[in-house]
Amino acid sequence: MSSGGNSSNVNRNSGSSNVITLNDSDEETEDSNLGSSSSTNLCKVCGAEKAALHYGALSCVGCKGFFRRALLKADQLECAANGECTVSVLQKTQCRSCRFNKCLREGMNPAYVRPNRDAPPKPRKPTTTVATCDQTDRGRTTKSREEWMKKMTVEMRTILMTLLNIETKVMKGDTQQEASKLYPLKGIDKLSDIIETPIQLKGKRTEMRYEAYRMAGNDELCAIAYRRLIAAIDWVESLSPLLGHLTPQDKIALVKSSFAPLMVFNFCARTAEACQDENVLCLCNFAYVPRNISKMYEDTYHLGNGLVERALNELVAVYREYGMREEEIVCVNAMICLNPLAKDVSDSLFEKIVELRNRIADCLFSIVKEVRLSPTPNVCYGHILLSLATVTELANAMSENLQFAQTFSNQGEIPLLTDLFGCFTVEPFFKEVDELAAMSLEKAKAEKKKEMSTQTDRLPPPRALLKRQATIDEDSEEPARQNFRLLQPPNNFYITEMLDDLRNNHAENHLISLNFDASNVSNAIASRPSFEDLGTVPSGSTVTRRIGSNIQGPSHLPQCGSTVTQRPTVPSSTTSSTFYNFPPPPGYPPLNAGYTPNVNYPNLYQQPQYFQNFQQNNYPSQVMEQQNYGNVESTSYPFPRNDGFVYNHPNIPYSHHNNSLQQNNFHNQYAN
């Protein structure tokens, strides 16, 4: 180091071994630089040193933090001295309003402030939190709607608020009447009438609320389906402004495709939201239906075929565990209504429906992401969308139930639902039955006639039931209703009963084909044929007659134990039909030409015990009075009457019962 007179040694760092030697000129230069830097690095707001560029102005760290905090409550800052306060290093905390205004005057820009940049980082969630959306606490959250809606974009908030307003409008009613008494609406038979003139529904909407307050009545199921159809129409009408101009045909197409899925989804989602009972399904009229609806209701209408049980197991249980929120329900309702694949939707509307549906799907995903506690919100979002496949399947089953109910339900036909499903028209079947019967009668007359004498083993046909009388009064119906009538029974009958009627008509036509000739059948009771006529059979047959051993007869008659085989002749006045006119057993109806029995009389008369009453009735008593068979002609024995028959009399033994050959001959005699 040099040791000149104008030089001096300056130790700038006493604790350091580094020694810097400056001469007088260098020291003066350094002092001038320090003075200039101290004057230029002062805060322009309060005058503090060590200022830097913050938010577009030279300011200290204190004024920087103050400006960022003051932006959050800028509207709450007020000055008591009319904005004339002095802002300095010592007095900068006296008035917040004047300090904030000076920050703005010095050029600090609020647009440069990024909120929550300096906030402490959020604690990382533990690794043991919910990983999927399948556990019970996946849908529980303590966030309010205002908290998570702030994190959504303006467009999503607008869509969500629009859907919530639509749901409130649809659920709210404008009448105090009961649904079962108001629906179905009279004078409204087509969807086009409502779509073209929506004013017809004013004052005809009942309030919809899903609560397990009481069990629904059987007659209320029809009104519930009708009310849900009006709700589907309201949803489509409310969404149409978001799609632009829609033609009536496009609206009808969207209503037809969304009616059943919308009803199934709301039944299940609202039940999971309002009730915790696993065996009830809430409806929209403050009522519910039980799981075993088929046992509790006579007519299940659109909820039959196990639909309630499937809905409770496959949808309600899933939604209840998941915890569906009101915001999620309205988004799904809108997605169900906006079906781009609906039948008869125009091509120009297809792209609009797809675009709006995608926007609603993004809104639904944002809701799931902000509300759910699950770290995988995409899994929860996927569960909601996958449930729509089950909703569609149950909706198809409900549509089939409604179509069947329109034809065969006791609650009658609803023209509006008929127009919804497009049922086919069929003329009443009771007119066709008469035409078929007439054709069968003509066909039977043309066939070859059959003789009864050849039908020795005839079995009685089944007894035909009486036809049910139709009660449809065509004159009282309107001409428009006569042109469009569903297939329905004349009265409240089941389909099995109607099929029985058709089968009985076929049986009656078969009887007509037999061509019974009642004019050739004589009355055996009035004619009283003789005993010889009783034993007479058609020519060609052999009769073996057995006489009881306890009866004394003439010498020309065989004694007990002997048999006589003879071939008697048939009188010319006796026809073959005479042999079918013997009296029936007691308790059986008489056999005549105008009656079709359900008892096989020829087989019945083959029983030998039928004739064990000879000694107890008038016929054997008249024979016993003669005491001599030689004095009585063989043709004077009366025909046995049909009163006082005694079966299986124990006091009269007959030896011919032990002889199988004689017994068969005895059977042939009376069976023919």
From Swiss-Prot:
Cellular component aspect of the GO annotation: nucleus
InterPro entries named in the record: HNF4-like_DBD, NHR-like_dom_sf, Nucl_hrmn_rcpt_lig-bd, Orphan_Nuclear_Rcpt, Znf_hrmn_rcpt, Znf_NHR/GATA
GO MF annotations in UniProt: DNA-binding transcription factor activity; RNA polymerase II cis-regulatory region sequence-specific DNA binding; zinc ion binding
DNA-binding region: 40-115
Stretches the record annotates as Disordered: 1-38, 550-577
ZnF NR C4-type span: 43-63, 79-98
Ranges in coiled-coil conformation: none
Gene3D superfamilies the UniProt entry points to: Erythroid Transcription Factor GATA-1, subunit A, Retinoid X Receptor
Compartments reported by the entry: Nucleus
Record carries keyword Transcription regulation: yes
Start and end residues of each NR LBD domain: 155-424
PROSITE patterns: NR_LBD, NUCLEAR_REC_DBD_1, NUCLEAR_REC_DBD_2
Record key words, sorted: DNA-binding, Metal-binding, Nucleus, Receptor, Transcription, Transcription regulation, Zinc, Zinc-finger
Low complexity compositional bias, start-end: 1-19, 562-577
Family stated for the protein in its record: Belongs to the nuclear hormone receptor family.
Physiological role: Orphan nuclear receptor.
Protein name: Nuclear hormone receptor family member nhr-5
Organism this protein belongs to: Caenorhabditis elegans
Gene for this chain: nhr-5
